[in-house]
């Protein structure tokens, strides 16, 4: 795998997100990522700070273009806790948990995010408006109801499958309800 290929795959996905125009300023965007899967290895076996760095940089460009708030999911060893900026935890009254993600417990991506955010904290859970799962890390528990899968053309980042989702409000009221557009 070359860093150029990885960056190109990510740029394609970032472009698809921005072209879709579904992300709004201040939306929470959850990212689950196995850098091992990106490298073509089984999840949890070959975490890579270099891969995490490239992914983080490209996601920052998505953040800059859309105004979203990034949230990074840790691995199952930290119960899929979430790394966010302290301002997000405070704004949404998210209780902080006592853990610092590292490559071996939390995962390389969450550890990298924790090391490079301005004032990071780890929270137990979050309810995001959208998200991206790189390498089948199971982000569904952190998405608002109702999750709507997005079918982007770019389906892989190197070897890792990518799944993207947005959310929509529940439709309530039954057959008499009017939902507009």
Curated annotation (Swiss-Prot):
InterPro entries: Antibiotic_NAT-like, DUF436. Belongs to the UPF0340 family. This is UPF0340 protein OB2986. It comes from Oceanobacillus iheyensis (strain DSM 14371 / CIP 107618 / JCM 11309 / KCTC 3954 / HTE831). Transmembrane segments: none annotated. Coiled coil: none annotated. HAMAP family: UPF0340 (MF_00800). It holds the Pfam family DUF436.
